[in-house]
């Protein structure tokens, strides 16, 4: 899909970046959920969905603990899956905790203990109607190194859920699933997952697909060669019936891949962002065809950044600084949606003081206001 623009924003952004840092002039930062002593995190793992001005986001709610490294969550205390919903385009939010979405009992999710009361894992028969606009799925993992993984599904915009359903390993040493999928048709879905490498460690991106409404899920392809380090946490956009662009988290940068045969094979386009401290991307397509990527910036000054591509991911702008007031590197995992009015809602976990709780925040902003 090609779009002719009279004055490409990308060119303007590059020229502007030579003179000053890029920021949206109208960005509004909001607290979505914050509670003293708690760790709220990782929207990128759980997913975001929208229906007009109705937006639904998932996240993990555990307990804060000031660890020596990594995430500041107490791995010895149970965590739970939580949703937050906005009916006004991200201005206000309410917390939801459907019973069917809770993690399986007495195990781990993303290495964090689960409680005793969640529904047990089971094999699910499939038969899902992907053409239902209210149908959504979320994918979760036990260990970030080697899985295993499961999924939940909802047919009513996340008000009620069924699961957890065993996902399988697709012949891989392990599957560490987060939520990234594309609906291709009423019974056809492509899912982008992280698999363990041959040494049993994270990870590399694989593509799986169902053509029979989830009754069977089949391995389709690897996205790139097995890395020496890791290549994980994809975020995908369909450009056409055959073309898909996917952004992938690397150790300290973001890779962008493209497939022109609907996911059968992939080519590396570029590194969209470098030296960011390690954080997953969230990529969406604007109404005019531009690609917009957001991610957490885990170096000083800590914050949330964005970049834009005018040419389907071939090149990217300089960083757009959504905020720079982070208290430490334990932040990010963004997910972004485009509202009907064209404004963007970027949701992420955040901190303004590294020694205090992690909270869920949102930035509402307009790409057209970037200067």
Regions found by a protein language model. Name each.
Residues 6-15:
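Bacterial N-terminal signal peptides
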Residues 1-4:
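Positively charged n-region of N-terminal signal peptides that target proteins for export
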Residues 20-371:
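Asp-box/BNR beta-propeller blade signature and adjacent active/binding-site loops
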